[in-house]
């Protein structure tokens, strides 16, 4: 069977998903990420959510094309509003702005309370999101860079817990870590 090909941007998110995760893809669009993770055996099921019917239908189409509709749930909802806290422990929110990602997390405090792994890939407002995460008790464990064409993307690996205060430079560029 054919497998979905991930772009470098989505592959950087996929690399951070732990084996056996209960996974949600917020703003799934085509559902390439959860389909690839299922094909690789990294996860056993997924919740794919989107705010608009069109992208959610494309997601269903992708899952159907690869024979995975029985292993995925599709939710038409705003952010995490249609996902119950006990359904997932790993959440990807990629392809939207940092302010939108912060608003989604603010509306779902259970992501912090249940210590979910958050894989965040803001397309804009990265300094805003770093500041918001720090102020709301999350820690960025690491950041991965990926490149597609001339564009660089940053993926944040985020957990609940206090983060050392970021300097103004770190708010803009991220904290440099080894490994």
PLM ranges: what are they?
Residues 52-54:
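Conserved SAM/SAH-binding beta-strand->alpha-helix loop
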């Amino acid at each position: 069977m054919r497998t979905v090909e991930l772009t470098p941007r989505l592959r950087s998110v996929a690399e951070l998903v732990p084996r056996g995760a209960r996974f949600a893809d917020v703003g799934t669009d085509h559902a390439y990420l959860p389909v690839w993770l299922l094909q690789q055996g990294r996860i056993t099921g997924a919740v794919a959510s989107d705010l608009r019917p069109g992208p959610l239908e494309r997601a269903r189409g992708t899952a159907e094309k690869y024979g995975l509709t029985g292993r995925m749930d599709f939710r038409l909802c705003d952010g995490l509003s249609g996902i119950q806290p006990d359904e997932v422990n790993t959440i990807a929110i990629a392809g939207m702005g940092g302010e939108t990602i912060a608003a989604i997390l603010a509306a779902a405090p259970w992501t912090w309370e249940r210590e979910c792994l958050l894989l965040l890939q803001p397309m804009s407002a990265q300094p805003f999101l770093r500041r918001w995460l720090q102020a709301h008790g999350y820690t960025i464990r690491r950041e991965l860079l990926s490149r597609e064409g001339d564009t660089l993307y940053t993926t944040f690996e985020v957990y609940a817990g206090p983060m050392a205060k970021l300097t103004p430079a770190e708010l803009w560029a991220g904290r440099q870590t080894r490994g």
